[in-house]
Amino acid sequence: MGIVMLIMAVTALNRLNLSIAGKTIEEEFGFDTIKMGHIFSSFLWGYALFQIPWGYICDRFGPLRTLTASILCFGFGAGMMGVAPRLAASAGLSVLLLFQIIRFFTGVGEAAVSPSCVRVIASWTNLKERGFASGLQSGGLGLGGTVTPIFIAWSTIHYGWRTSFYLCSALALLTVVIWRAYATDWPEEHKRVNAAELDQIHPGAHSGDDRRRRTAKAKSVPWLKMLTSASVWGLILAYGCQGYAFYVYYNWFYFYAVKVRGLHMMEAAAWTSAPFLAMAVLSPVGGWFSDRISRRSGRRQGRIYAVWLGMGVSAILLLAGSHLRITVIALPMIALAAGFNYFATSNFWASCIDLAPDFSASLSGLMNTVGNVGGAISSTATAYLAVHQGWSRALDVAALITVGSGLLFSFVNAGQTVEERPT
């Protein structure tokens, strides 16, 4: 799980870097808020459209090769951002257009990460620990987001925004080296995992024959059963709403701190770490809470209660924080709203494994596609609402959609796989 958290942290770094360096880019090239929203959306469309293909590839070929290709792709995209203005000038292209193309490509690369990490969790964790393990995965994203604002702001101030992207690219390459050195697709393939540990991970299911059986099954994803399942539709639509709210924090918190709350660059960067610190802490707590309830009342109740609690508290905090005038109270409340969003989010990923244990990467890809369509809509809609109706109204809409996420998740029955469902 340590390597999974590292990959998620580096993913956060390469996704969030534009949100911090974006203020400097905006000033250098004369972009307005709506144009920056288009650049943010470009990443998310690439990220959303390639979730399902990457999920299938991971189920078919395993996370080892899939994540290697993924990290190389988005690391290359980060490096290209630094040279984009020079390329645009020499080719006679619009810098805005080239930024959008590169961020789309970066999104394509990052699209494999979450489905592949879910596949790792499905292969490497015990049934009773899925919620907590999924929380650690999401917590890795939070840890990366905690460090990124200060790291990117510091490197941008001292060395320029281009250097910040080159550093992100270099860290991605280092992560590939670590991943290839230590990871395997299955616990059975790892030299340091013994028979007792295999029995603890998947009791009675660690033989080579069983591994080959599971690999063969993964080649035929039961899409019809998935797409006719009320649980799957509840899951993916709820995650679409979650994605809308999540990308308000992810893309716009720094801009909000600078433009609305009047903070300076480093001060805003420090505050921008707060939502991700809250995510890093509360995501594993949400997974642990869900696992604990699941052992007492069943997985359906465990996942639903955790999502209801997380999304409900998140909506209240976001709504209250957006209308408070006192910055030192408002920003922590909005940061905690992000944290409780992720208290719930770990249970979405765990539910992918609950519903489709042998096809978890494919279902995760489907879910994350819808989630990031919500995020892409959020990136543009939040900018539009902020410009035309004010930031309070933009955040009110995000709070309302957060409530919708919790309500839609009520249809998810994590106690029954899609293959067990009567036809």
Q: Model segments located where?
A:
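C-terminal ends and interior cores of transmembrane alpha-helices
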Residues: 72-92, 312-325
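C-terminal transmembrane helical hairpin of 12-TM major facilitator-type secondary transporters
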Residues: 300-347
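Central cavity-lining transmembrane alpha-helices of secondary-active solute carriers
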Residues: 41-56, 273-286
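Cytoplasmic helix-loop-helix junction between adjacent transmembrane helices
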Residues: 102-142
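Extracytoplasmic
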Residues: 3-31, 249-254
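Extracytoplasmic gate region of multi-pass secondary transporters
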Residues: 18-20, 226-284, 344-345, 349, ...
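Helix-loop-helix hairpin linking two adjacent transmembrane segments in secondary transporters
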Residues: 141-190
